[in-house]
Amino acid sequence: MSTARTLLLRRASWLAPLALLLAACGGGSEGASTTTPSTGLSVIAAIGDQIFHDTSLSASRRMACASCHDPAHGHSSASADAVVPAGGPGMATPGFRKAPSLNYLNLTPAFFFDAEGTPTGGLTRDGKADSLRAQAATPFLSAHEMANGDLPAVVARLRIASYAEDFRSLFGANIFDDPDAAFDRARVALQAYQLEAREFHPYDSKYDQFLAGRVALSARELQGLALFNSPAKGNCAACHPSARGADGSPPLFTDFTYDNLGVPRNPAIAANADPAYFDLGLCGPFRTDLANRADLCGAFKVPTLRNVAVTAPYFHNGRFKTLKEAVSFYVRRDTHPEEWYPRTADGSVRKFDDLPPQYHRNVNTTEAPYNRTPGQAPALSAEEIDLVVEFLATLTDGYQP
C-alpha cells in the first residue's frame, strides 16, 4: 500500500467516529450540524469555540486552551521568551515543552509505524494522542496547565459555564450527571471546532498564493526555496515537503515522522535543573508505551513549518528564540558544535547535552546537512541561511498582496 494511501486511511480512522457521534447528537430543535449564524460553525463546533476560550474551566480561572494557542501565532504560544506559559492553580507552575501549533492538524494521521518501522503521525510532540479529541483531555487535568483535580471537577465547571444550556440542548438535559460522557462531549466539541474553523487551516500564505499563480515570490524568496529543497544544501524538504501532493493538495510542510536532532538543553525549563531529568520524546517521560524502545529515545515529531516565522521559540524545548538561530543550528550543529553546546572542565564540547550518553547514537548525523564534521564548511553560508529564513516567512497565513 502506498504511503499516501496509508496516511489517508489513518486520517479517516479518527474522523469517522466523530462523524458518527455528530450524527447522533441533538437534544433539542437544532442538530449538531446546524450552522450558527454568528459564527458560521455547527452548533457543536460553536460550543467547542466557547470551551477553547473559556478560562473558567481551569483551577485558576485564568487559563484556557487559547492561553497557549494564540491564533496570531499559528495557534502556538505567543511569547518567544517563555517555553510555555506557567499554569496550575496559582498560575506559577512551570511547564515542560513549548506549546506546539494547532494549525493544520486536521490531516495528521493517528500514530503508527510504517512498513519500514518508521514512527509516523499522532498529535503532540510525542504523538501519544491519536486525535484532536484525545489530545484535548490532557490540558484540563495537567498540573502545569488547567490543573483540574479530576474529570468530575472539569464537568462541574462546565455545568455552570455560560454555554451550559446549549451543551444540554445538544447532548441531553442530564448530560452533566454523567461526568465521563460530558467530558467526552466537551472534547468532541473542541475537535469539531478545530476541524471546522477556517482559522486552523486557512491555506492563505504568500506561498499558497504563489502556488495558485496569484502572486510571485521575490528573487530572494525563490533562492531560499531552492536552498530549502536542495538535497545538497538545506535538505529541509526531506522532512518538510514543499510540493503539492499528487492530488494537487497544498503541502503541509511535514511528513509526520519523528527525528532526533540533539537539540541543546534549555536551562529555562525548570525541570532541567535536575541533571537526571531528560525529555526523551517518544520513549518518555510523558509517553510510556514506547519506554522500552531505546532506539526512539530523543525523537520528536517533525512539525509543520507553516507559520514557523511567528511561532518562536523553536523546537520541543523552546531552546532558540529566533528562526535564524534555529536554521543556523541545523546547518552548523556538526561543523561548529561549540556554538551550541557547553564545554566540560577540560575544554571539550559536551555535544548533545540534553540526552543521556547512551542515546547519543540516536541523533541524526547521516542526512544532510548533519553529515559533516568540525573543520568542514556548513551546508549553508550565512547569506544562504538568511535566504532560507526569508522563504520561510512566506509560509505565514493571512498574506495580503
Where in the sequence are the language-model features?
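Extracellular low-complexity, Gly/Ser/Thr-rich intrinsically disordered linkers
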Residues: 304-401
